[in-house]
């Protein structure tokens, strides 16, 4: 498997190091364990915590999507 070299802060390094479950655990293992390819939206939102700005934006887009769906159902509106 190819490898990449990245630069991270000392703080990020220490955080990753503390998340290793054993000496055999690689930093790649840690990253993939905590950030799998697919995550549930609820997990992401729980991780970032309350965000009123994001909630307002989601509500606005959701309303726009519902309105568009209604126009598709009733094209005369």
From Swiss-Prot:
Keyword Magnesium found: no
InterPro entries reported in the protein's UniProt record: Put_antitoxin
Record bears the keyword RNA-binding: no
Family annotation (Pfam families): VAPB_antitox
Keyword vocabulary terms for this entry: Toxin-antitoxin system
HAMAP family: UPF0330 (MF_00794)
Family membership noted in the UniProt record: Belongs to the UPF0330 family.
Function, as annotated: Possibly the antitoxin component of a type II toxin-antitoxin (TA) system. Its cognate toxin is VapC3 (Potential).
Protein name from the UniProt record: Putative antitoxin VapB3
Species assigned in the record: Methanosarcina acetivorans (strain ATCC 35395 / DSM 2834 / JCM 12185 / C2A)
Protein encoded by which gene: vapB3
